[in-house]
Curated annotation (Swiss-Prot):
Gene3D superfamilies from the UniProt entry: 1.10.287.3510
Stated name of the protein: NADH-ubiquinone oxidoreductase chain 4L
Keyword annotations of the record: Electron transport, Membrane, Mitochondrion, Mitochondrion inner membrane, NAD, Respiratory chain, Translocase, Transmembrane, Transmembrane helix, Transport, Ubiquinone
Species of the source: Platyrrhinus dorsalis
Quaternary structure annotation from Swiss-Prot or TrEMBL: Core subunit of respiratory chain NADH dehydrogenase (Complex I) which is composed of 45 different subunits.
Ranges annotated as spanning the membrane: 1-21, 29-49, 61-81
Principal location listed in the UniProt entry: mitochondrion
Family stated for the protein in its record: Belongs to the complex I subunit 4L family.
Function text: Core subunit of the mitochondrial membrane respiratory chain NADH dehydrogenase (Complex I) which catalyzes electron transfer from NADH through the respiratory chain, using ubiquinone as an electron acceptor. Part of the enzyme membrane arm which is embedded in the lipid bilayer and involved in proton translocation.
Amino acid sequence: MSITYMNMFMAFTISLLGLLLYRSHMMSSLLCLEGMMLSLFVMMTMIILNTHLTLASMIPIILLVFAACEAALGLSLLVMVSTTYGMDYVQNLNLLQC
């Protein structure tokens, strides 16, 4: 395993640990999710380029589309929650309330 793959795996792991440990604010959770998506994109792109898989070359682009949709939905949810409740604490949110 080359050092670039190890760096991307460590970036994914650190983002996952950040999501698990620092989930008090919604903004920090969204940033950790974006870090995970970025490291997955770079890893998939490097693997596809190194193995010369031409049929799978659209998969990183599809992942970026899903990451952009996730970011847009997350930011709109963050704006809605912060204007409604005045805070973005994840622990104080109860999504089952009307």
